[in-house]
Amino acid sequence: MAGSLSWVAGRRLWGLVPLACRSFFLGVPRLFHVRVTLPPPKVIDRWNQKRAMFGVYDNIGILGNFEKHPKELIKGPVWLRGWKGNELQRCIRKKRMVGNRMFIDDLHNLNKRISFLYKRFNRHGKHR
């Protein structure tokens, strides 16, 4: 096939040649893949454990005669129950509450994380 370009070389030249000057030996433009069929619908269990228990404690005060606060029902570390904040505030709170009971290596790593986050929050951010 003397005098004609290979398919790959012609494909590369498509973008370089202006639209009005293109000839047929460069080939046709690549047609984007068009999906003809729809994917099968996913089967979702609407009553799994997580979805079934969503919002179960929302009105515990109304039904439970206001004896328990919803934060008392949260399971997790003591320094995180019913509290929200960023990572630096969370680490400082953890150090304040359980720092005296931590292993030396864990406390050292926590102090390193606090110093890094302190520098990070003071050097970068929206109001700098």
From Swiss-Prot:
The keyword Oxidoreductase does not apply. It comes from the Eukaryota. Signal peptide: none annotated. It is found in: Mitochondrion. GO terms for biological process: mitochondrial translation; translation. Component of the mitochondrial ribosome large subunit (39S) which comprises a 16S rRNA and about 50 distinct proteins. Interacts with OXA1L. The gene is MRPL51. This is Large ribosomal subunit protein mL51. It comes from Bos taurus (Bovine). Its main location: mitochondrion. InterPro entries: Ribosomal_mL51. Residues 1-31 form a transit peptide. GO terms for cellular component: mitochondrial inner membrane; mitochondrial large ribosomal subunit; mitochondrial ribosome. Keywords: Mitochondrion, Ribonucleoprotein, Ribosomal protein, Transit peptide. Belongs to the mitochondrion-specific ribosomal protein mL51 family.
